[in-house]
């Protein structure tokens, strides 16, 4: 399993998802909004299938809903976000990943509030 952390504001990273794979590249791909929303359910409110849904992705944060009931998914994983695999932290780079440290975050904000 890979833990996905999004950089939500300066100095604040939030554990947004667990992705059940052992490949950093696959975890990155599965947390991209390409033809839908990786963080939304299999079907949208209008019944249309969400082609970015994958049951290997476990969302850990609530999605935002506006006053009209419209639900907004999370952004795609991008450069400088981080992933944890086997206790090691990897930073997403323009091409690939860079090892950050061997110690997982100790002060993670689980719900994205500073």
PLM features per residue range, with description:
Residues 13-14, 38, 97-102:
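Tryptophan-centered short beta-strand motifs
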Residues 73-109:
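Short, compact, well-ordered microdomains
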Residues 1, 110-114:
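Short intrinsically disordered terminal tails
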Residues 22-85:
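Short, conserved turn/kink motifs that form compact alpha/beta structural patches or helix kinks used as
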Residues 1-34:
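N-terminal disorder-to-order initiation segments that are Gly/Lys/Arg-biased
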Residues 17, 27, 94-98, 114:
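A sequence-composition feature that detects small, non-aromatic residues
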